[in-house]
């Protein structure tokens, strides 16, 4: 039982270290110097609307969900062509059956 607890503890610590390491590249956004008055009035408005941001959300910079969804909708991969090819094959079978019904 102690061995299992030790393995679970090591796993949790490793995952915590991995998560912390994955957030570190974004932390430079928070530490970057900003010109005085550049974002005056924007930050309090966002904070009031969204509530207090968690540490990871602050490090990422407060992004609105519509912007993230728009970015995802622009991405297309090679699977689109594969799906079109698969649907074309299925349509071929259906069209053949429909043509057989029309001609006596």
Curated annotation (Swiss-Prot):
Where are the Phosphoserine residues found in this chain?
A: 96
Q: Name one GO biological process term.
A: G protein-coupled receptor signaling pathway
Q: What name goes with this protein?
A: Gastrin
Q: Which residues form the propeptide?
A: 22-58, 96-104
Residues with the Phenylalanine amide modification: 92
Gene label: GAST
Q: Which PROSITE patterns match?
A: GASTRIN (PS00259)
Q: Does the keyword Signal apply?
A: yes
Ranges for region Disordered:
27-77
State the superkingdom. Answer: Eukaryota
Q: Which UniProt keywords apply?
A: Amidation, Cleavage on pair of basic residues, Hormone, Phosphoprotein, Pyrrolidone carboxylic acid, Secreted, Signal, Sulfation
The similarity comment for this entry is:
Belongs to the gastrin/cholecystokinin family.
Residues modified as Pyrrolidone carboxylic acid: 59, 76
Any idea which residues bear Sulfotyrosine here?
87
Q: What does this protein do?
A: Gastrin stimulates the stomach mucosa to produce and secrete hydrochloric acid and the pancreas to secrete its digestive enzymes. It also stimulates smooth muscle contraction and increases blood circulation and water secretion in the stomach and intestine.
Q: Record the organism.
A: Bos taurus (Bovine)
- One cellular component GO annotation, for this chain's record? extracellular space
């Amino acid at each position: 039982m102690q061995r299992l607890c030790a393995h679970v503890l090591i796993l949790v610590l490793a995952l915590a270290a991995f998560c912390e390491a994955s957030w570190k590249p974004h932390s430079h956004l928070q530490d970057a110097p900003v010109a005085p008055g550049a974002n005056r009035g924007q930050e309090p408005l966002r904070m009031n609307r969204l509530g207090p941001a968690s540490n990871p959300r602050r490090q990422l910079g407060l992004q609105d969900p519509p912007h993230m969804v728009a970015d995802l909708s622009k991405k297309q991969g090679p699977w689109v062509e594969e799906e079109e090819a698969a649907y074309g094959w299925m349509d071929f079978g259906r069209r053949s059956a429909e043509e057989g019904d029309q001609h006596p």
